[in-house]
Amino acid sequence: MGTLSVNQNKLQKRLRRLAGEAITDYNMIEDGDKVMVCLSGGKDSYTMLDVLLHLQKVAPITFEIVAVNMDQKQPGFPEHVLPAYLKELGVEYHIVEKDTYSVVKELVPEGKTTCSLCSRLRRGTLYTFADEIGATKMALGHHRDDIVETFFLNMFFNGALKGMPPKLRADDGRNVVIRPLAYCSERDIQAYSDMKAFPIIPCNLCGSQENLQRQVVKDMLVEWERKHPGRTESIFRALQNVAPSQLADRNLFDFTSLKIDENATPRFLDVLNI
């Protein structure tokens, strides 16, 4: 790629800066880490790898990067694309072959959403492989919009206020998942992917499914953002600014013990002169 335009340079710097801030804020990568970068062939994971490779060069710490792709044996999957791309970059990589496609097609009725089962099978396989290669961190390409969408999905359909944290220790206790693009918008990532002309691999398994719950939420947020620019960022900031005493979760705040403080200074209000 030739010389970047002013706007392209700003975009690249913004993504690198935001990823660096997220990594620092959540202590995602530490000196000596071996980071397994999960590469799906989509715009998000390509951008994540690109940004991490840059940060690896300029960071004050030393860490390894190993790219890993999972070949789920989907029909028409272009097996040559990622190896060719990663060889050209000179990045260490592994292709993990696991026929989860057949499992998903067998267990999920025709017309039903495959995303949930597919994701669980893929995640379990990657956790195991991360352990095998001694990876200390597993990097996923989820961005700010993914995190906000997940928050609303859980609220609307699961009755829970939870999202997709920038850093997570897996239930097995042996894997730490990080999301370096947590502060980055999907719009910026899409623009960067277009600019870099990454060799995108579409998902034949779920990409053609319509009316997914996530797509409904995504469309809602896009419409909100169109009418009120900055709303998605505001919602994301809210996830970083939780006030348990202003919600209703008894496990997070002790409401049962609340009572007046006899030693508190009385507040007098002259209601007649308001």
UniProtKB/Swiss-Prot annotation:
Official protein name in the record: tRNA-cytidine(32) 2-sulfurtransferase
Motif (PP-loop motif): 40-45
Cofactor section: Mg(2+); [4Fe-4S] cluster
The reaction(s) this protein catalyses: cytidine(32) in tRNA + S-sulfanyl-L-cysteinyl-[cysteine desulfurase] + AH2 + ATP = 2-thiocytidine(32) in tRNA + L-cysteinyl-[cysteine desulfurase] + A + AMP + diphosphate + H(+)
Pfam family, one: ATP_bind_3
Family the UniProt entry places it in: Belongs to the TtcA family.
Subcellular location: Cytoplasm
Positions annotated to bind [4Fe-4S] cluster: C115, C118, C206
Gene this chain is encoded by: ttcA
InterPro entries: Rossmann-like_a/b/a_fold, TilS/TtcA_N, tRNA_Cyd_32_2_STrfase, tRNA_thiolation_TtcA_Ctu1
Organism from which the protein derives: Pseudomonas putida (strain ATCC 47054 / DSM 6125 / CFBP 8728 / NCIMB 11950 / KT2440)
HAMAP family referenced in this protein's UniProt entry, alphabetically: TtcA
GO biological process, one term: tRNA thio-modification
Function: Catalyzes the ATP-dependent 2-thiolation of cytidine in position 32 of tRNA, to form 2-thiocytidine (s(2)C32). The sulfur atoms are provided by the cysteine/cysteine desulfurase (IscS) system.
